[in-house]
């Protein structure tokens, strides 16, 4: 029977060793940022309405629910002297992710075979599956290579790199339009050129970042793991059991990610139709199809596309805040404990989401992003730091994959029910979905205080 021995036998790693180990996450998160900031926009450009948007976003959590535990299970059992344990999954996932990043903004080019929306949903599924193949082993890699006293630092550095990648990805469409004059308001096209080229650049950076981690990171061999006492030589026959702490963290994750999902799906629509009182994109484009020279409709189209770019800026800002705040998390956690640190961050995130409803213009929307960025930094680091200390090393990958259930299930729940709620309870006003998300995150704050981990 296997017994987990002291994790302090793992070598202490330097800042730059941890940085290199997590650098691939910069590319992964740039891909996620492009998806989060532009998928709703692309889908509405292809003809989706606000009530059906959340249904398309079901693709992401469903693929994560299926893919991550499988990848975690097999990466725990994979070893190649040449390629390692987790790194083969990084590379294969990156290949398919880059393909999906190139294909999604070009979904309209395949309409001779299938409807554009169906093609877009298919490419979105490929993208999410590939992201998950690359992403899941990264969480396990940090826990594999770091002793327990460096877990918070490791996941915080990972969060900082996630933030940097997300800032670049979120800002990219705006930068291409405003700095390099790549157009964003061409009539008659489904997806604007600045968005398309942003996805191409994202694909290149994604692959480059993954390759950096592959070539710069060493993994412990099975023999080294036994020699250092990380795992026992004997095969485990213990009954598979999820620790109580993992269930408690799962409840926190449920309410946290429900709130985040509401923000990702509905911010663009809320900014356009609640803050600026614009007609739907479907209405604007239908009007231009009948009267292409209508000046009012043209100006509304331009403003709508500019606001779509601005959502990328807003998402980039909260990710930038998270990248900065991540460096302070280990210090704060040492002083107040991991649970209280995470609870405070979630409190700020819930406040920020509710605050978005009351902002009078796009510039004012920056203020709530500061609070959301603090919550995002903690969400990406603290649950994993708390979890890593209570699960066996030899099952790190599969447990991290199972823990992903508590991220994907709330997104599935939100995708199934938030659309009808917005339509029937909120009268089609997507801004109320942001308030609902904020309330859920406040519940996450309360449940975090029940977890007793220093």
Residue ranges of each PLM-predicted region?
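Intracellular loop-helix junctions on the cytosolic face of multi-pass helical membrane proteins
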Residues: 1-15, 108-122, 131-134, 138-141, ...
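Helix-to-loop junctions at the C-terminal end of transmembrane segments
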Residues: 66-83, 324-337, 422
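Hydrophobic core of transmembrane alpha-helices in multi-pass small-molecule transporters
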Residues: 100-134, 364-378
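Loop-to-transmembrane helix entry/capping segments in MFS-fold secondary transporters
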Residues: 50-51, 148-158, 308, 391-403
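Helix-loop boundary and gating motifs at the non-cytosolic
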Residues: 6-63, 248, 252, 256-281
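Intracellular juxtamembrane helix-capping segments at the cytosolic ends
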Residues: 133-146, 378-392
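C-terminal ends and interior cores of transmembrane alpha-helices
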Residues: 90-114, 347-360
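C-terminal transmembrane helical hairpin of 12-TM major facilitator-type secondary transporters
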Residues: 321, 333, 339-383
